Amino acid sequence: MASAGLQLLAFILALSGVSGVLTATLLPNWKVNVDVDSNIITAIVQLHGLWMDCTWYSTGMFSCALKHSILSLPIHVQAARATMVLACVLSALGICTSTVGMKCTRLGGDRETKSHASFAGGVCFMSAGISSLISTVWYTKEIIANFLDLTVPESNKHEPGGAIYIGFISAMLLFISGMIFCTSCIKRNPEARLDPPTQQPISNTQLENNSTHNLKDYV
C-alpha cells in the first residue's frame, strides 16, 4: 500500500474535488450573457445555471427564478443535472470508503480489508470525476456551438461561466485522487502474491537422523 503521506494527499485532493463538484452543481452561473440587449437598461448580467436563472441589476438587486419544469429543459441541461448529482453521490461515497481504507486510520480491520476499501474509494472518485467531466464538456460544447451560430442574435449568445471551470478542475482533482488510491492497492497485492513461502530451518538432529537412515539403506 502506498505511504500514509501519499494517501493523505490524495484524500485532501478528493475533499477539494467534492467541495468543488457540490459548489459547481449549485451555482447559477454555468453560462452568462455576452452582451445584454440594449432595451434592458437596468440589467447588468444574466446568469443561467442547472437549477435556476438569475439576473443582476445595476441597482444592486439580484433576482433568481427556479427551473420547475424538467421536460422543457434542453437535453444537455438535463444530462448535466443527472451527471453532476451522480458525481456528488459517488464522491461522497468515495470519501466514506477511502477513510476506512487509509493507512493512517484504524478503521477497516486487517490490511486486506483496508486495501479493498481504498480501491473501492478510488473507483468512486474516478467515476465521479468522469461524470463531472462529461457534464462540463458537453455543456461547454453547447455554449460554443450556440455562440458560433450566425443565426443566433447577439443578445442570446452566452459564454461559459465560473461554475463550468470549477466543475472541470474538480473533476481533475477527483480523477487524480482516485488514481492514487487505486494504484496504491494494485502495487501492493502482486508483491504479496509473489512472496515465496517461508520454510522452517532444518535442525542438526534432523540432519543426523536423515543421514543415519540413508546409511542403513546401504547396509
From Swiss-Prot:
It is found in: Cell junction, Tight junction; Cell membrane. It is a multi-pass membrane protein. Pfam families: PMP22_Claudin. GO terms for cellular component: bicellular tight junction; cytosol; Golgi apparatus; plasma membrane; tight junction. GO terms for biological process: bicellular tight junction assembly; calcium-independent cell-cell adhesion via plasma membrane cell-adhesion molecules; cell adhesion. Keywords: Cell junction, Cell membrane, Membrane, Tight junction, Transmembrane, Transmembrane helix. Belongs to the claudin family. This is Claudin-20.
